[in-house]
From Swiss-Prot:
Localization per record: Cell inner membrane
Role according to the record: NDH-1 shuttles electrons from NADH, via FMN and iron-sulfur (Fe-S) centers, to quinones in the respiratory chain. The immediate electron acceptor for the enzyme in this species is believed to be ubiquinone. Couples the redox reaction to proton translocation (for every two electrons transferred, four hydrogen ions are translocated across the cytoplasmic membrane), and thus conserves the redox energy in a proton gradient. This subunit may bind ubiquinone.
Topology term for the membrane: Multi-pass membrane protein
Lineage: Bacteria, Pseudomonadati, Pseudomonadota, Gammaproteobacteria, Thiotrichales
Source organism per UniProt: Francisella philomiragia subsp. philomiragia (strain ATCC 25017 / CCUG 19701 / FSC 153 / O#319-036)
Protein name in the entry: NADH-quinone oxidoreductase subunit H
Family from the record: Belongs to the complex I subunit 1 family.
Keyword hit for Membrane: yes
Broad enzyme group: translocase
Encoding gene per record: nuoH
Major location category of this protein: membrane
InterPro entries: NADH_UbQ_OxRdtase_su1/FPO, NADH_UbQ_OxRdtase_su1_CS
Stretches that traverse the bilayer: 4-24, 75-95, 108-128, 154-174, 181-201, 233-253, 272-292, 308-328
Length: 336
């Protein structure tokens, strides 16, 4: 029993520590990419080309004093960042990086991930309420409404993938797309593919859906009163969720670790490329799109965000799920 616990703890560390490093350098890439798009240089002072900037940013955050606001609920104030951080990293337990390379290959992997990503909003709402600040509270209320609105659209998109694949296990979904580019679900499920990724941007409170922490309205929203390591936990959770949405989009709609050249004359040429490389390459595309969208689009008004979620995304995904179910039931389309 003890040996099992130790091995499990080791596997968890092998996922969490590299993920934190990826998050750190994702912030560096974000500043460089957005700087280039805005005709700036970006960080270039700490280390060669600014490569040590994320390390020193982390040191700065974790060495800062933790300030607790007057009349705040101290217990909830301290527990909220953990409630935001823990589910964001726990969701990675069921992500397969290649065939057999997964911490826990659950039959209900997608349901588990949907549950974990939904839990993060509790940390945001509790942080807003416990901080004893009107700006924090407004940000928390916005976060709650926004997550509920876009979680439904994401849920319907996931249901469409599950119906098409005939499995809720993530490995099963990837294997159902084997056979090359034309077997990937982004073609027959294109509306669900687009809605899922846009809803993922909204779910992570990123621009142009970042009204939860709109600087011009409520300054920093739910984490305005947080400093030091507590703020860093919210920061780590946000970027881990962005990477999670990117890798899930790759898995559900772009075949995961499957090569795009399967069942083609080029299959033998690219056969040496490991599946994990294909997965990371596809994930990198969506990680870049998060940055591109942030640098390009202005922030929506809150009523526009709600209208987009309830009047466009939810009806669209619901109708497409019905269409996919009928196609699968009557043997029409690319699944037969």
């Amino acid at each position: 029993m003890l040996e099992y616990i130790l091995w499990t703890a080791l596997y968890v560390l092998l996922i969490v520590i590299p993920l934190i490093l990826v998050v750190a350098y994702y912030t560096y890439a974000e500043r460089k990419v957005i700087g280039y798009m805005q005709d700036r240089i970006g960080p270039n002072r700490v280390g060669s080309f600014g490569l040590l900037q994320p390390i020193f940013d982390a040191l700065k955050l974790f060495l800062k004093e933790i300030i607790v606001p007057t009349n705040s609920n101290r217990y909830l104030f301290f527990i909220a960042p953990i409630l935001a951080f823990a589910p964001a990293y726990a969701a990675w337990a069921v992500i397969p990086f290649s065939k057999g390379v997964v911490l826990s290959d659950m039959n209900l992997g997608l349901l588990y991930i949907l549950a974990m990503t939904s839990f993060s909003v509790y940390g945001i709402v509790i942080a807003g309420w416990a901080s004893n600040s009107k700006y924090s509270l407004f940000g928390a209320l916005r976060a709650g409404a926004q997550v509920v609105s876009y979680e439904l659209a994401m849920g319907f998109a996931i249901v469409g993938v599950v119906i098409a694949a005939g499995s809720m296990g993530i490995t099963g979904i990837i294997e159902s797309q084997a056979g090359g580019l034309w077997h990937w679900y982004f073609i027959p499920l294109f509306p669900l593919f687009v809605v899922y990724f846009i809803a993922g941007i909204a779910e992570t409170n990123r621009a142009p859906f970042d009204v939860v922490e709109g600087e011009s309205e409520i300054i920093a929203g739910h984490h305005i009163e947080y400093t030091g390591s507590r703020f860093a936990l919210f920061f780590l959770a946000e970027y881990a969720n962005m990477i999670l949405i990117s890798i899930l989009t790759s898995i559900m709609f772009l075949g995961g670790w499957c090569s795009p050249f399967e069942a083609t004359p080029l299959e033998a040429v690219f056969n040496f490329v490991p599946g994990v490389v294909w997965l990371f390459a596809k994930t990198g595309i969506f990680m870049f799109m998060f940055l591109w969208v942030r640098a390009t689009f202005p922030r929506y008004r809150y009523d526009q965000i709600m209208r987009l979620g309830w009047k466009i995304f939810i009806p669209l995904t619901f109708v497409w799920v019905v269409v996919v179910a009928c196609m699968v039931r009557f043997g029409v389309g690319p699944w037969w």
